[in-house]
């Protein structure tokens, strides 16, 4: 999705002030307060709100606050709205990673693997803040088969002109979306694209 670049000056100033307040509350662990402030910031975005870059990061910040309060259903809603608004050409590895983490905590293995794998393809192992998430993914997918360099972000998003993703990522179409869940033991039968 194409996003509008600059907010009107008065709204930009309000957004910056609210963002600073929200980040301060967030950094101090006052997540509920941060959510309220982010909601205020969201409410001043001109319609359609989804067209502004600020919408994506506000929704991600709201999702992160929910995640850290173990409110996974709410976090899923916020992160998925950020993910959808960003679109496949502007994918943020952190948003994709958090979606994978949330699905994992909601015991949705298929979507957890899907989004953790997307995050891995976008950013490699560096995106994994929690070693347990990387181990979880490695136990389900042979990650070495998905990159020529052992997972340094090679694959979807690393080189948009390379449609074969290093000849490894047969699960993902040209926009990085899954063609379906493939259990780890079944990868060989699909071959390289």
Summary of predicted features, one role per range:
Residues 3-8, 45-52, 84-89, 126:
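Flexible helix-coil transition and linker loops at the boundaries of alpha-helical arrays
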Residues 41-45, 80-85, 120-123:
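Amphipathic alpha-helical segments of tetratricopeptide repeats
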Residues 104-127:
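TPR/TPR-like (Sel1-like) alpha-helical repeat modules
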């Amino acid at each position: 999705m194409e996003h509008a670049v600059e907010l009107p000056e008065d709204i930009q100033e309000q957004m910056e002030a609210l963002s600073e307040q929200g980040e301060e509350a967030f950094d101090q662990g006052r997540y509920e307060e941060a959510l309220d402030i982010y909601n205020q910031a969201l409410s001043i975005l001109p319609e359609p709100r989804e067209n502004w870059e600020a919408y994506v990061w506000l929704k991600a910040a709201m999702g992160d606050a929910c995640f850290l309060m173990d409110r996974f259903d709410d976090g899923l809603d916020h992160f998925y709205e950020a993910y959808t608004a960003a679109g496949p050409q502007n994918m943020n590895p952190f948003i994709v990673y958090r979606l994978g983490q949330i699905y994992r905590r909601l015991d949705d293995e298929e979507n957890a693997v899907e989004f953790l794998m997307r995050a891995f393809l976008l950013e490699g192992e560096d995106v994994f803040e929690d070693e347990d998430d990387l181990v979880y993914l490695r136990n389900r997918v042979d990650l070495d088969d998905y990159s020529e360099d052992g997972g340094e972000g090679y694959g979807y998003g690393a080189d948009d002109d390379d449609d074969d993703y290093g000849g490894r990522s047969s699960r993902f179409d040209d926009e990085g979306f899954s063609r379906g869940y493939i259990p780890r033991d079944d990868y060989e039968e699909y071959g390289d694209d």
